[in-house]
């Protein structure tokens, strides 16, 4: 699922790049068919409307990043993983992940079972992976795997073959989990980002399907 440049005028939710979703991935772990990987990419390192880079801080500590998983085909979440970040000494960040199952998975909040806390966030090339039981976690900067000829698209589909994203970065939230967590037949996955407003969580970003309208709709 690609969700780049989804805000008004190709901007970011609340003007904060750390809240901006770029891609959602879900796939079987290579070499281990009993495990799956879900990944949410946020915080592009670039702006489409400016040559200025975005902030070096990977994630917004005041935000809630959620994976919603529907396991019975009714488009309502039956399982949720919520991720929050906090500052830790020396300018570092850590992550806490909560697992929520059942009726409350469709809601919003900071409830649920904590399955990992104070997991390190990668600021550089080194991939800091945290393992807890059957779960694996990664949080931090990576090269943006998406590819697209942005300049060709904006030039009336006169494509150049150049990948605009080849030197761009994003911040990844990656969870490796056993297939027993997921449905055997019907499975739906989407993500969203929320921030607090007067003690209430407010959704500022959501995605689960490719965002094709900005590429194919001539009115954009």
Question: What is the role of each PLM region?
Answer:
Residues 216-220:
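Positively charged, low-complexity/disordered segments
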